[in-house]
Every structure is written in structure tokens, then in C-alpha cells.
Amino acid sequence: MFVTLAELIANARADLRCLDAETAMNELQETGGTIIDVREPLELETSPAPQSLNIPRGILEMKVMDIVTDADHPLYLHCATGGRATLAAEQLQRLGYTNVTVITCPVEVVRRHQESQASK
């Protein structure tokens, strides 16, 4: 029997740390973590998230270890709606990253909270 994408994401989230954008941005101020946007570059053109590091979901496993070399460094993942970020976070944990959080809201909300934090 097949599993739907919604079920796959829900099952993955059960084992992941998930936060809303406001909580994640406040926590980032304390942890010095890195926000990773797993959307494709074309998506960034129409809806940028300027304080995020873009590593598209399709190449995440191939690139992340060159960029984030500390397995315990706080990582906060987001995408357009939270689905790809959830699946990406699951993969990062499989790679050995121990401090991975999914921001589970639309990218527009993430951007709004990034802008709010930057203006403080």
C-alpha cells in the first residue's frame, strides 16, 4: 500500500522538532543557528528570504557537509509550505546532524519575521 505525501510528511514530523516562524526567529537570536531555505533558486526570485542560506532540497545531501561542518550546529529549515523542509530535516538527521528544526509555516511568514528581527 502506498503512503500519501501528506502521510509521509506527518510521519516525519512526529520525529522532528518543529517551530513556527516567530519562535524560530527568537531562538535564532540566542543560538546563532543557520536558516536553510530548501526551495529551488527560481522560487527565490519571486519570493526571497534574504537571511536564509539556499541549499535546494535536490542537492542538500551533496552540499550541506561542505557548508555546515559541525553536526551540533543549530539548523532551521524552511521552504514554501514546510513539506520539503520536513523531508530535508529528516535526511539531515540521517546524515548525523543533531540540532535540526523545521519551520512549519509558509515562506512569507518566515520572511516577515526575518524582516521584523532585522529592524530591531
Kindly label every feature range from the protein language model:
Residues M1-T34, P41-P74, A80-K120:
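Rhodanese-like catalytic fold shared by cysteine-dependent sulfurtransferases
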